[in-house]
A protein has these predicted regions:
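Phosphate-binding site of ATP-dependent enzymes
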Residues: 1-41
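A long amphipathic alpha-helix within ATP-dependent nucleotide-binding catalytic cores
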Residues: 25-82
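C-terminal active-site "lid" helix and adjoining low-complexity regulatory extension at the edge
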Residues: 81-115
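General "foldedness" signal
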Residues: 19-22, 38, 75, 87-89, ...
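Short, solvent-exposed loop/turn segments at secondary-structure junctions
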Residues: 1-6, 11-16, 71, 76-83, ...
C-alpha cells in the first residue's frame, strides 16, 4: 500500500491442484482467520519458520511498491537467497476468494487512489 507492506502471504508445497497458504503479519504471527481455506488452498502449518531474509524482503517490497496504491510483490527465499518473482496489480483479477470478506474490506480501506 504505497510502499508499506502490511502482511506476508505464504504459499508452499505447491502441487498440481493445490497450494498450502497462510497469512502472517510483519512480526511473523500467523493469522488463519484472514483466510478461507479449501481443497485448492489448504491451511499451511502455523509454525512456518520466519525467513532469514524477511527484513531485507520487506525492505525490497517497500521500495518496489513505492508510488503504487496497491501491488503484490512476489519474493521467494530459496537456500538463503532472495529471488524476485513479479509485481501484480490485480491479484486473481480482484476475485480473491481465499481471503475473508472482512480481511478484503480492511485491505481495501488501506488503498488511497489519486484524484
Amino acid at each position: 500500500f504505497d510502499g508499506r507492506p502490511e502482511c506476508v502471504y505464504v504459499t508452499m508445497n505447491r502441487k498440481k491442484d493445490s497450494v498450502e497458504v497462510m497469512t502472517y503479519d510483519l512480526d511473523w504471527v500467523a493469522h488463519p482467520e484472514y483466510s478461507v481455506f479449501s481443497d485448492h488452498y489448504p491451511c499451511a502449518s502455523l509454525d512456518v519458520p520466519r525467513p532469514e531474509n524477511l527484513d531485507f524482503m520487506l525492505k525490497m517490497a517497500a521500495d518496489l511498491a513505492e508510488g503504487f496504491p496497491q501491488v503484490r510483490i512476489d519474493l521467494y527465499e530459496v537456500g538463503g537467497k532472495v529471488y524476485f518473482g513479479e509485481m501484480t496489480f490485480t491479484s486473481n483479477a480482484g476475485m480473491m476468494s481465499y481471503f475473508t470478506p472482512e480481511f478484503l474490506l480492511e485491505a481495501g480501506k488501506k488503498v488511497t487512489l489519486p484524484l
